Amino acid sequence: MERKVGTVSRGIRCPIIREGDNLPEIVVNSVLEAAASEGFSLRDRDVISVTESIVARSQGNYATIEDIAADVKAKLGGGTIGVIFPILSRNRFAICLKGIAKGAKKIVLMLSYPSDEVGNALITWDQVDEAGINPYSDVLTLEKYRELFGENKHEFTGVDYVQYYADLIKEAGAEVEVIFANQAKTILQYTDCVLNCDIHTRARTNRILLAAGAKVVCSLDDILNAPVNGSGCNERYGLLGSNKSTEDKIKLFPRECQGMVEEIQASILEKTGKHVEVMVYGDGAFKDPQGKIWELADPVVSPAFTSGLIGTPNELKLKYLADNDFKNLSGAALKDAISAAIKAKQGSLVGNMASQGTTPRQLTDLIGSLCDLTSGSGDKGTPVVLVQGYFDNFTD
Protein backbone atom coordinates (compact mmCIF):
# COMPACT_ATOMS: atom_id res chain seq x y z
CA MET A 1 0.00 0.00 0.00
CA GLU A 2 1.20 3.50 -0.81
CA ARG A 3 2.44 5.41 2.21
CA LYS A 4 -0.08 8.04 3.36
CA VAL A 5 1.61 9.69 6.36
CA GLY A 6 4.53 12.13 6.30
CA THR A 7 6.09 13.83 9.29
CA VAL A 8 4.87 12.73 12.75
CA SER A 9 5.84 14.41 16.03
CA ARG A 10 5.24 12.39 19.21
CA GLY A 11 5.61 13.55 22.79
CA ILE A 12 7.28 10.76 24.79
CA ARG A 13 6.34 10.43 28.45
CA CYS A 14 9.25 10.04 30.85
CA PRO A 15 9.79 9.71 34.60
CA ILE A 16 10.40 12.88 36.61
CA ILE A 17 14.11 13.58 36.24
CA ARG A 18 16.31 14.24 39.26
CA GLU A 19 19.93 15.22 39.68
CA GLY A 20 22.26 12.31 39.00
CA ASP A 21 19.79 10.30 36.92
CA ASN A 22 21.23 8.41 33.95
CA LEU A 23 19.47 10.53 31.36
CA PRO A 24 20.69 8.78 28.19
CA GLU A 25 19.42 5.46 29.54
CA ILE A 26 16.07 6.98 30.56
CA VAL A 27 15.60 8.64 27.15
CA VAL A 28 16.44 5.47 25.20
CA ASN A 29 14.22 3.28 27.36
CA SER A 30 11.33 5.76 27.23
CA VAL A 31 11.44 5.93 23.42
CA LEU A 32 11.64 2.15 23.01
CA GLU A 33 8.85 1.56 25.54
CA ALA A 34 6.66 4.11 23.75
CA ALA A 35 7.31 2.36 20.44
CA ALA A 36 6.32 -0.99 21.92
CA SER A 37 3.25 0.49 23.62
CA GLU A 38 1.95 2.42 20.61
CA GLY A 39 2.96 -0.03 17.89
CA PHE A 40 5.37 2.07 15.86
CA SER A 41 8.95 1.32 14.82
CA LEU A 42 12.02 3.51 14.75
CA ARG A 43 13.47 4.35 11.35
CA ASP A 44 16.76 5.72 10.09
CA ARG A 45 16.96 9.53 10.41
CA ASP A 46 14.24 9.76 13.04
CA VAL A 47 15.01 12.62 15.42
CA ILE A 48 14.98 12.16 19.19
CA SER A 49 14.81 15.56 20.90
CA VAL A 50 15.41 16.11 24.60
CA THR A 51 14.33 19.30 26.34
CA GLU A 52 17.17 21.29 27.89
CA SER A 53 15.34 21.39 31.21
CA ILE A 54 15.78 17.71 32.01
CA VAL A 55 19.37 17.77 30.80
CA ALA A 56 20.23 20.56 33.23
CA ARG A 57 18.22 18.87 36.00
CA SER A 58 20.09 15.60 35.59
CA GLN A 59 23.38 17.53 35.63
CA GLY A 60 22.41 19.37 38.81
CA ASN A 61 23.26 22.63 37.07
CA TYR A 62 21.82 25.06 39.62
CA ALA A 63 22.91 28.26 41.32
CA THR A 64 21.48 30.54 44.01
CA ILE A 65 20.84 34.27 44.00
CA GLU A 66 23.75 34.54 46.46
CA ASP A 67 26.02 32.95 43.85
CA ILE A 68 24.82 35.47 41.27
CA ALA A 69 25.37 38.33 43.72
CA ALA A 70 28.92 37.23 44.48
CA ASP A 71 29.86 37.01 40.80
CA VAL A 72 28.23 40.35 39.93
CA LYS A 73 30.02 42.08 42.79
CA ALA A 74 33.36 40.56 41.81
CA LYS A 75 33.05 41.50 38.15
CA LEU A 76 31.22 44.84 38.33
CA GLY A 77 32.54 46.30 41.57
CA GLY A 78 29.46 46.29 43.79
CA GLY A 79 28.71 50.01 43.43
CA THR A 80 26.29 51.58 40.96
CA ILE A 81 25.56 49.17 38.14
CA GLY A 82 23.60 49.88 34.99
CA VAL A 83 21.34 46.95 34.17
CA ILE A 84 20.14 47.47 30.62
CA PHE A 85 17.75 45.85 28.16
CA PRO A 86 16.46 42.94 30.30
CA ILE A 87 13.55 40.89 29.04
CA LEU A 88 10.29 41.15 30.98
CA SER A 89 9.87 37.72 32.54
CA ARG A 90 9.19 36.37 36.02
CA ASN A 91 10.56 32.97 35.06
CA ARG A 92 13.57 34.10 33.05
CA PHE A 93 14.89 37.33 34.49
CA ALA A 94 13.23 38.34 37.76
CA ILE A 95 15.17 35.87 39.89
CA CYS A 96 18.42 36.84 38.16
CA LEU A 97 17.62 40.47 38.96
CA LYS A 98 17.35 39.57 42.65
CA GLY A 99 20.88 38.24 42.61
CA ILE A 100 22.21 41.13 40.53
CA ALA A 101 20.71 43.67 42.93
CA LYS A 102 22.22 41.87 45.92
CA GLY A 103 25.62 42.44 44.33
CA ALA A 104 25.23 46.22 44.00
CA LYS A 105 24.60 49.33 46.08
CA LYS A 106 22.46 50.89 43.37
CA ILE A 107 20.86 49.63 40.17
CA VAL A 108 20.08 51.97 37.30
CA LEU A 109 17.54 49.88 35.43
CA MET A 110 17.27 50.88 31.78
CA LEU A 111 14.31 49.30 30.00
CA SER A 112 13.84 49.34 26.25
CA TYR A 113 10.47 50.58 25.00
CA PRO A 114 7.83 50.03 23.78
CA SER A 115 8.86 46.37 24.23
CA ASP A 116 11.78 44.21 25.24
CA GLU A 117 14.02 42.31 22.85
CA VAL A 118 11.66 39.37 22.43
CA GLY A 119 8.48 41.43 22.13
CA ASN A 120 7.04 41.65 25.66
CA ALA A 121 5.38 45.06 25.57
CA LEU A 122 5.56 47.71 28.25
CA ILE A 123 3.34 49.90 26.09
CA THR A 124 2.01 49.77 22.54
CA TRP A 125 3.34 51.51 19.46
CA ASP A 126 0.02 53.36 19.30
CA GLN A 127 0.70 54.80 22.75
CA VAL A 128 4.16 55.88 21.64
CA ASP A 129 2.72 57.59 18.56
CA GLU A 130 -0.03 59.32 20.52
CA ALA A 131 2.50 60.62 23.07
CA GLY A 132 4.58 62.15 20.28
CA ILE A 133 7.87 60.72 21.50
CA ASN A 134 10.74 59.29 19.49
CA PRO A 135 11.78 55.91 20.93
CA TYR A 136 15.04 56.03 18.99
CA SER A 137 16.27 59.13 20.77
CA ASP A 138 14.02 60.10 23.69
CA VAL A 139 15.05 59.08 27.22
CA LEU A 140 12.23 58.87 29.75
CA THR A 141 12.49 59.04 33.52
CA LEU A 142 10.12 56.91 35.56
CA GLU A 143 8.12 60.03 36.38
CA LYS A 144 7.78 60.99 32.71
CA TYR A 145 6.86 57.43 31.76
CA ARG A 146 4.08 57.37 34.37
CA GLU A 147 2.87 60.81 33.31
CA LEU A 148 2.61 59.72 29.67
CA PHE A 149 1.49 56.12 30.01
CA GLY A 150 0.37 55.45 33.57
CA GLU A 151 0.34 51.85 34.76
CA ASN A 152 0.51 49.21 32.05
CA LYS A 153 0.14 45.52 32.80
CA HIS A 154 1.43 42.72 30.58
CA GLU A 155 -1.29 41.33 28.33
CA PHE A 156 -0.81 37.72 29.42
CA THR A 157 0.70 37.86 32.92
CA GLY A 158 -1.13 40.90 34.30
CA VAL A 159 2.14 42.19 35.77
CA ASP A 160 3.32 45.80 35.74
CA TYR A 161 6.97 44.90 35.14
CA VAL A 162 8.23 48.41 35.82
CA GLN A 163 6.91 48.30 39.37
CA TYR A 164 7.70 44.61 39.79
CA TYR A 165 11.36 44.95 38.86
CA ALA A 166 11.81 48.12 40.93
CA ASP A 167 10.33 46.39 43.97
CA LEU A 168 12.59 43.35 43.52
CA ILE A 169 15.66 45.58 43.48
CA LYS A 170 14.58 47.41 46.65
CA GLU A 171 13.77 44.14 48.42
CA ALA A 172 17.28 42.92 47.60
CA GLY A 173 18.70 45.90 49.47
CA ALA A 174 19.80 48.15 46.60
CA GLU A 175 18.73 51.62 45.57
CA VAL A 176 16.94 51.78 42.23
CA GLU A 177 16.52 54.33 39.46
CA VAL A 178 14.43 53.40 36.41
CA ILE A 179 14.84 54.97 32.99
CA PHE A 180 13.57 54.09 29.53
CA ALA A 181 15.83 54.30 26.47
CA ASN A 182 16.84 52.32 23.40
CA GLN A 183 20.40 53.56 22.90
CA ALA A 184 22.88 51.51 24.93
CA LYS A 185 25.29 54.39 25.52
CA THR A 186 22.57 56.37 27.34
CA ILE A 187 23.39 54.37 30.47
CA LEU A 188 26.87 55.92 30.58
CA GLN A 189 25.29 59.19 31.75
CA TYR A 190 24.48 57.34 34.98
CA THR A 191 27.32 54.83 35.48
CA ASP A 192 30.29 53.39 33.64
CA CYS A 193 29.81 49.87 35.01
CA VAL A 194 27.20 48.10 32.91
CA LEU A 195 25.56 44.69 32.79
CA ASN A 196 23.80 44.40 29.45
CA CYS A 197 21.04 41.82 29.67
CA ASP A 198 19.96 41.48 26.06
CA ILE A 199 20.29 38.03 24.53
CA HIS A 200 20.68 37.93 20.77
CA THR A 201 22.07 41.46 20.36
CA ARG A 202 24.51 41.33 23.27
CA ALA A 203 27.72 41.39 21.21
CA ARG A 204 26.71 44.61 19.47
CA THR A 205 25.62 46.18 22.76
CA ASN A 206 28.99 45.32 24.31
CA ARG A 207 30.83 46.84 21.37
CA ILE A 208 28.81 50.08 21.51
CA LEU A 209 29.36 50.50 25.25
CA LEU A 210 33.09 49.89 25.10
CA ALA A 211 33.49 52.27 22.16
CA ALA A 212 31.56 54.93 24.10
CA GLY A 213 33.94 54.73 27.07
CA ALA A 214 32.38 52.27 29.51
CA LYS A 215 34.80 51.21 32.25
CA VAL A 216 33.39 47.73 32.85
CA VAL A 217 30.96 45.90 30.59
CA CYS A 218 29.55 42.43 31.20
CA SER A 219 26.80 40.48 29.50
CA LEU A 220 24.67 37.82 31.13
CA ASP A 221 26.92 35.20 29.56
CA ASP A 222 29.79 36.60 31.66
CA ILE A 223 27.96 35.92 34.93
CA LEU A 224 28.30 32.36 36.31
CA ASN A 225 30.42 31.27 33.38
CA ALA A 226 32.48 29.49 36.04
CA PRO A 227 31.43 27.99 39.40
CA VAL A 228 31.02 30.34 42.36
CA ASN A 229 31.24 28.73 45.79
CA GLY A 230 30.63 25.32 44.23
CA SER A 231 27.63 26.44 42.17
CA GLY A 232 26.64 25.24 38.75
CA CYS A 233 27.69 27.29 35.75
CA ASN A 234 27.65 27.47 31.99
CA GLU A 235 31.03 28.22 30.49
CA ARG A 236 29.58 29.46 27.21
CA TYR A 237 26.27 31.08 28.16
CA GLY A 238 26.49 32.00 31.84
CA LEU A 239 23.05 33.17 33.00
CA LEU A 240 21.60 33.13 29.50
CA GLY A 241 18.95 30.43 29.16
CA SER A 242 18.44 30.12 32.91
CA ASN A 243 15.04 29.57 34.52
CA LYS A 244 13.58 30.03 37.97
CA SER A 245 13.78 26.83 40.02
CA THR A 246 12.77 28.07 43.49
CA GLU A 247 12.40 31.52 45.04
CA ASP A 248 16.17 31.71 45.56
CA LYS A 249 17.61 29.28 43.00
CA ILE A 250 17.93 29.09 39.22
CA LYS A 251 18.41 26.22 36.82
CA LEU A 252 21.12 27.09 34.34
CA PHE A 253 21.25 26.21 30.65
CA PRO A 254 22.77 22.72 30.25
CA ARG A 255 26.49 22.39 29.70
CA GLU A 256 28.69 19.86 27.95
CA CYS A 257 25.79 17.88 26.48
CA GLN A 258 27.31 16.94 23.12
CA GLY A 259 28.50 13.65 24.57
CA MET A 260 24.98 12.88 25.77
CA VAL A 261 23.33 13.23 22.36
CA GLU A 262 26.01 11.06 20.79
CA GLU A 263 25.58 8.45 23.54
CA ILE A 264 21.83 8.27 22.89
CA GLN A 265 22.46 7.94 19.16
CA ALA A 266 24.94 5.10 19.71
CA SER A 267 22.64 3.30 22.15
CA ILE A 268 19.68 3.39 19.76
CA LEU A 269 21.90 2.06 16.96
CA GLU A 270 23.09 -0.78 19.18
CA LYS A 271 19.57 -1.72 20.34
CA THR A 272 17.64 -1.27 17.08
CA GLY A 273 20.12 -1.03 14.22
CA LYS A 274 18.65 2.36 13.32
CA HIS A 275 20.75 5.49 12.87
CA VAL A 276 18.76 8.30 14.45
CA GLU A 277 19.64 11.93 15.02
CA VAL A 278 19.51 13.41 18.52
CA MET A 279 19.31 17.00 19.75
CA VAL A 280 18.77 19.02 22.91
CA TYR A 281 16.21 21.81 22.50
CA GLY A 282 15.02 24.76 24.54
CA ASP A 283 12.76 27.57 23.39
CA GLY A 284 11.37 27.29 19.90
CA ALA A 285 12.04 30.22 17.60
CA PHE A 286 8.46 31.06 16.64
CA LYS A 287 6.65 34.36 17.12
CA ASP A 288 3.22 34.66 18.71
CA PRO A 289 1.02 36.72 16.35
CA GLN A 290 -1.33 37.80 19.16
CA GLY A 291 1.13 38.95 21.81
CA LYS A 292 3.92 39.72 19.29
CA ILE A 293 6.35 37.74 21.45
CA TRP A 294 9.30 35.97 19.85
CA GLU A 295 9.57 32.71 21.76
CA LEU A 296 13.35 32.60 22.05
CA ALA A 297 14.60 33.65 25.48
CA ASP A 298 17.34 31.03 25.27
CA PRO A 299 20.62 31.99 23.58
CA VAL A 300 20.13 29.23 20.99
CA VAL A 301 17.36 26.77 20.15
CA SER A 302 19.70 23.78 20.38
CA PRO A 303 22.94 23.71 22.40
CA ALA A 304 23.87 20.20 21.22
CA PHE A 305 22.95 17.96 18.28
CA THR A 306 24.34 15.11 16.20
CA SER A 307 26.06 15.84 12.91
CA GLY A 308 23.13 14.86 10.69
CA LEU A 309 21.24 17.93 11.90
CA ILE A 310 23.76 20.43 10.58
CA GLY A 311 22.47 22.60 7.75
CA THR A 312 19.18 23.73 6.24
CA PRO A 313 16.40 21.97 4.29
CA ASN A 314 17.04 21.31 0.61
CA GLU A 315 13.54 21.08 -0.81
CA LEU A 316 11.54 21.91 -3.91
CA LYS A 317 8.21 23.72 -3.68
CA LEU A 318 5.60 21.26 -4.95
CA LYS A 319 3.02 23.91 -5.79
CA TYR A 320 5.63 25.88 -7.77
CA LEU A 321 6.41 22.80 -9.85
CA ALA A 322 2.71 22.02 -10.32
CA ASP A 323 1.81 25.59 -11.33
CA ASN A 324 4.84 26.29 -13.52
CA ASP A 325 7.04 23.45 -14.76
CA PHE A 326 4.22 20.93 -15.04
CA LYS A 327 1.13 23.12 -15.37
CA ASN A 328 -0.16 21.12 -18.34
CA LEU A 329 -0.02 17.79 -16.52
CA SER A 330 -2.46 16.16 -14.11
CA GLY A 331 -3.12 12.87 -12.35
CA ALA A 332 -0.49 10.15 -12.56
CA ALA A 333 1.56 12.06 -15.13
CA LEU A 334 1.85 15.06 -12.80
CA LYS A 335 2.78 12.85 -9.87
CA ASP A 336 5.45 11.05 -11.90
CA ALA A 337 6.92 14.32 -13.20
CA ILE A 338 7.15 15.87 -9.73
CA SER A 339 8.65 12.67 -8.32
CA ALA A 340 11.28 12.68 -11.06
CA ALA A 341 12.12 16.34 -10.34
CA ILE A 342 12.57 15.59 -6.65
CA LYS A 343 14.85 12.64 -7.35
CA ALA A 344 16.93 14.75 -9.75
CA LYS A 345 17.23 17.83 -7.53
CA GLN A 346 20.66 19.34 -6.92
CA GLY A 347 22.57 19.02 -3.68
CA SER A 348 22.04 22.73 -3.06
CA LEU A 349 18.98 24.62 -4.28
CA VAL A 350 20.09 28.05 -3.10
CA GLY A 351 18.97 30.57 -5.73
CA ASN A 352 16.71 28.08 -7.52
CA MET A 353 13.22 29.53 -8.05
CA ALA A 354 11.66 26.11 -7.49
CA SER A 355 12.85 26.20 -3.87
CA GLN A 356 11.33 29.59 -2.96
CA GLY A 357 9.15 29.53 0.13
CA THR A 358 10.68 26.32 1.51
CA THR A 359 11.77 27.82 4.85
CA PRO A 360 15.56 28.10 4.48
CA ARG A 361 16.36 28.01 8.20
CA GLN A 362 18.67 25.87 10.29
CA LEU A 363 17.33 22.35 10.76
CA THR A 364 17.82 22.54 14.52
CA ASP A 365 15.79 25.77 14.69
CA LEU A 366 12.93 24.26 12.69
CA ILE A 367 12.87 20.91 14.47
CA GLY A 368 13.45 22.52 17.87
CA SER A 369 10.43 24.77 17.34
CA LEU A 370 8.31 21.77 16.36
CA CYS A 371 9.46 19.93 19.47
CA ASP A 372 8.85 22.90 21.78
CA LEU A 373 5.28 23.16 20.51
CA THR A 374 4.81 19.40 20.87
CA SER A 375 6.15 19.06 24.41
CA GLY A 376 4.68 22.29 25.74
CA SER A 377 5.97 23.94 28.90
CA GLY A 378 3.44 22.73 31.46
CA ASP A 379 2.08 19.42 32.66
CA LYS A 380 2.14 17.19 29.57
CA GLY A 381 5.02 15.17 30.99
CA THR A 382 6.64 14.67 27.58
CA PRO A 383 10.16 16.15 27.81
CA VAL A 384 11.33 13.93 24.95
CA VAL A 385 9.93 14.27 21.44
CA LEU A 386 10.30 11.75 18.63
CA VAL A 387 10.02 13.24 15.15
CA GLN A 388 9.62 10.74 12.32
CA GLY A 389 9.62 11.38 8.59
CA TYR A 390 11.03 14.90 8.78
CA PHE A 391 13.61 14.20 6.11
CA ASP A 392 11.25 12.27 3.83
CA ASN A 393 9.80 13.70 0.65
CA PHE A 394 6.94 13.03 -1.77
CA THR A 395 8.77 10.07 -3.30
CA ASP A 396 9.40 8.13 -0.06
Model-derived regions: residue spans:
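Conserved mixed alpha/beta catalytic, RNA-binding, or beta-rich assembly cores of soluble enzyme
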Residues: 1-44, 53-396
